[in-house]
Amino acid sequence: MDGAVMEGPLFLQSQRFGTKRWRKTWAVLYPASPHGVARLEFFDHKGSSSRGGRGGSRRLDCKMIRLAECVSVVPVTVESPPEPGAVAFRLDTAQRSHLLAADAVSSTAWVQTLCRTAFPKGGWALAQTENQPKFSALEMLENSLYSPTWEGSQFWVTSQKTEASERCGLQGSYILRVEAEKLTLLTLGAQSQILEPLLFWPYTLLRRYGRDKVMFSFEAGRRCPSGPGTFTFQTSQGNDIFQAVEAAIQQQKAQGKVGQAQDILRTDSHDGETEGKTVPPPVPQDPLGSPPALYAEPLDSLRIPPGPSQDSVYSDPLGSTPAGAGEGVHSKKPLYWDLYGHVQQQLLKTKLTDSKEDPIYDEPEGLAPAPPRGLYDLPQEPRDAWWCQARLKEEGYELPYNPATDDYAVPPPRSPKPAPAPKPQGLILPESGTTRGSGSKGFSSDTALYSQVQKSGTSGAWDCGLSKVGNDRAGVKSEGST
């Protein structure tokens, strides 16, 4: 059996059905050896670890903690300790966290012994005892301004699946450290057991944070290194993380107020020192002595550097040249400088001679008489459309243009349609029983006359005779006599 490094009573906190309670146990710490790994075992009472076989006492539910899986061992503060004067510390592994407690001296010894056994390369030393010699030649004092990067509480958490955690690639278990100015997420190195920072969130960039019985979550702002989003971590110490973060934020606010007050006091003292002093009047500077600065004036008010004056085209109207400006210096006259003078002289000559030709620019714009109206200046609406009586329009420009003949493709004129011959009328017989008198002067209106054409043998003329229809019919001249 391996020899124990340390053993003694320890209070172990267990949670069942939502209720937390402390249970007194007997803990035994074994180091790593050829016969076993470094571990921490718990028993019901003292002496149970020395018994073997079936006669030994029953172990607790938390049978053994392998120190190879230990992540951190840190002292913590609890609201309800198991007994007065007890100090608690937390042992975090890759699977869960264990909250232990003992009296003040034993708790410190347990923390240092566990750290030395679990982390042999950390250089942990036991607390000084009274038997150890005291070196008075060199005294070391702690710097109150020194703030190590690892200062704060560490909590074992498990990342939950959210949009932000998937974007950052968070999966599995991590260490969440609550520092003075930020939250830091740590992970174990691939080759070494050293904690390496993975992500951090400053308190000033956190939008909100909260806790639950089984988790702790916060919402990061868009200026955080991880980007915006909600991060949720599963842990049984959500309330402890929440209180630690709240205390760090309140402390940071207090430091900010103290800094602002110091700045105000410095400003007031500086104003009080300069209040009794007379400020000398500013010395006027010669604008011509020193060149102006590059950005002394805005862009729209920059002055043009002095240079030889040149008159541009249409720079000044006729007669507005200042007197004495060009005396003694023969300056080149601009182009079209006497155009307006010639135009005015022509207008005067035109008015005096009263010429019939319209000169150029004879009258100002807007005063010239209106030109005579053309043929199509006053369009008229078509009226009396009923007078056309649906007659065809004259064909003309609506016909297609023929480029070969350079003329419109006018169809040939149409010949007039022949008039139809009159249809012959049938013979109308008088009604039976009607008698006509011999003394009648003419024929009745309903009597049809038929001419009988006969050809004479001698003269070759046609003789027309009337056949007697009745007794009263008179003779009719032949068509040849007409």
UniProtKB/Swiss-Prot annotation:
PTM annotation (Phosphotyrosine): residues: Y295, Y336, Y340, Y361, Y376, Y397, Y408, Y450
Domain IRS-type PTB: 151-259
Domain PH, residue spans: 4-119
Phenotypic consequence of gene deletion: No visible phenotype. Mice appear healthy and are fertile.
InterPro entries according to UniProt: Docking_Protein_DOK (IPR050996), Dok1/2/3_PTB (IPR037751), IRS_PTB (IPR002404), PH-like_dom_sf (IPR011993), PH_domain (IPR001849)
A biological process from GO: Ras protein signal transduction
Compositionally skewed regions (Polar residues) per UniProt: 432-459
Region annotation Disordered: where it falls in the sequence: 269-328, 353-373, 398-482
Keywords: Acetylation, Cytoplasm, Nucleus, Phosphoprotein
Subcellular compartments: Cytoplasm; Nucleus
List of residues that carry Phosphoserine: S48, S269, S290, S415
Xref: PROSITE patterns: IRS_PTB
Tissue: Expressed in lung, spleen, skeletal muscle and kidney.
Chief place of localization: cytoplasm
Record note on domains: PTB domain mediates receptor interaction.
Protein's name in the database: Docking protein 1
Record organism: Mus musculus (Mouse)
